[in-house]
Amino acid sequence: MIVLGIESTAHTFGVGVAQDQVPFILANERHTFVPQTGGMKPSEAARHHTLVAHEILRGALDRARISIRDVDGIAVALGPGMGPTLRVGAVVARALSLRFNKKLVPVNHGIGHIEIGYLTTEAKDPLILYLSGGNTIITTYYRRRFRIFGETLDIALGNMMDTFVREVGLAPPYIVDGKHKIDICAEQGSSIIDLPYTVKGEDMSFSGLLTAALRAVKKHNLHDVCLSLREIAYGMLLEATERALALTEKGEIMIVGGVAASGSLRSKLEKLSNDWGVGLKVVPTSFAGDNGAMIAYAGLLALKHGVHIDVKDSTIRPRWRIDEVDIPWRD
């Protein structure tokens, strides 16, 4: 079975191809919208996706060395994400499904991140840290659902860091030579300043930390603020993770999502894992950020278990939570 997957939930338009035998991933093509100034405007990102969609789709099929007629299903991320960009991917997927008579498979973006993590890390039953620009979630699988133990109460960890470096003039670009600008800035910091630290049970709040850090730049060295922001944010995440480990007694931690590419976070989680005597599984950098391959692979798992929908039912879901998705393939 072969499934083509389309990702367009935020700044990246990606198309991947997955099959149910080794090698599982046949193609993973994408192009990311980078605003010249300020934050990302959904309408501008959607325009970008519309312009690159044909090229990325053609590139994925060529990379996989297949024709669209060879695929068994079209998987598409219907949420969560930004409405305008989600609609671009949905329109492309619907058109392909109707034109070539292919089954349409709805995929939750977060489930895509998690399933590509399982595939690439070979994790068995992990505590999952899903960390990206739009999500900060601590979860694990239980009885056909991913159950959330902790999450951000406001903005996500990745979004908080992106916003900070943009507001202080360090970005865009946000990533240079594989390092986030917050890490590059923090390398020259030497002192930790007092900033809000908010953990409630296994939930975290980052908005107050962001506001305080932006104010602190006026009184303190920027490098020290970067260092403090990063260390306090990661400290909050680690505390919540330890509480979830104590509760679930899992034997391994799996990190997925774009923030999984952070070397500084990885080193902290390696120490935490060693202290707790559990394994640490980190999704490869090539699959950490948003990509079409993860949608294709999650769609493949779903289609093999009979999950597909009519085009008329393919409404986008900008606030679609991972704990709302039935997972028939993990039992």
UniProtKB/Swiss-Prot annotation:
Keyword Metal-binding: yes
Top-tier EC class: transferase
GO BP annotations listed: tRNA threonylcarbamoyladenosine modification
Chain residues that bind substrate: Y130, L131, S132, G133, G134, D162, D183, S262
Annotated TM spans: none
List of residues binding Fe cation: H109, H113, Y130, D290
Cofactor(s) annotated in UniProt: Fe(2+)
Enzyme Commission no: 2.3.1.234
Gene3D superfamilies: 3.30.420.40
Location (main, coarse): cytoplasm
Keyword tRNA processing: yes
Keywords: Acyltransferase, Cytoplasm, Iron, Metal-binding, Transferase, tRNA processing
Gene Ontology CC, one term: EKC/KEOPS complex
Localization, UniProt: Cytoplasm
A GO MF label: iron ion binding
Catalyzed reaction equations: L-threonylcarbamoyladenylate + adenosine(37) in tRNA = N(6)-L-threonylcarbamoyladenosine(37) in tRNA + AMP + H(+)
Cofactor note: Binds 1 Fe(2+) ion per subunit.
Family, per entry: Belongs to the KAE1 / TsaD family.
Function, as annotated: Required for the formation of a threonylcarbamoyl group on adenosine at position 37 (t(6)A37) in tRNAs that read codons beginning with adenine. Is probably involved in the transfer of the threonylcarbamoyl moiety of threonylcarbamoyl-AMP (TC-AMP) to the N6 group of A37.
Protein name: tRNA N6-adenosine threonylcarbamoyltransferase
Organism (species): Metallosphaera sedula (strain ATCC 51363 / DSM 5348 / JCM 9185 / NBRC 15509 / TH2)
